[in-house]
Amino acid sequence: MDFSYNGDPVLSGINLTIREHDFIAFIGPNGGGKSTLIRLILGLIKPDKGKIRVLGERPGRHTQALGYVPQNVHINNHFPITALDVVLMGCLGTGGHFGQSRRTRKECEKEGLVTLERMGMAEHACKKIGELSGGQRQRVFIARSLMTRPRLLLLDEPTASIDSKGQRDFLKLLEALNKDVAIVVVTHDLFSVSSYVKSVACVNHGLHYHSEEEIKGQMLETMYACSVEDVCRVQVLTQVLPGAGHKHAGGADGTS
């Protein structure tokens, strides 16, 4: 699969299959195409060449199968909306109705509270979103994305506004969620995620994926005497981390 913007190549030769219960980290330099690849999977933009399939069909045909938390979620801190209100937005269909989810508002509220509890946020359900910390907000936004009962969760830089301890707690939470849903997380911080994800793909205009080697983040710097971003520039293949439960295979036609 290829994608360009205003004639400038952004991604080329992308070949990736995401399987059930995968937990993949996309790493790479700024401008390498990580967020663009997420947007392509979501169907927000279309490839120039090749095709993307979600559950065997074009992106957009199974929107509820995809949960998405963007890098920047803009919410006015003074807007009088609670954490539960934000979560319930995940039930809304087109036109702002609950009908698309085939659940009544009461059913959605009950499920929303259960989801917040799963995210460790039940006690904050009635708090204004502006009163929550960065890590707490991220948990609320993920709870919102889970309200469609997705098969795949896409997270763009989810730990960017969270401190070190909060990052560890957050990643443990994702590890637990991974029992029920496949997860793709975009990150610059390979070292913080390396103990939790099952595989890592380097995205730098291409996607470099290898399922045989087991390379720790520390080894990358030792072997190449450079940072993760420099490693991506020399197109080091994907690392599969210790503890990976299974191997992956790329789709021959550039499917996702």
What are these regions (language model features)?
Residues 128-132, 136:
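Conserved ABC ATPase signature
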Residues 42:
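Helix-to-loop junction immediately C-terminal to a conserved catalytic motif
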Residues 88, 103-124:
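Conserved ABC ATPase "signature" region
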Residues 216-256:
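ABC ATPase nucleotide-binding domains
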Residues 50-66:
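Conserved ABC transporter NBD signature motif
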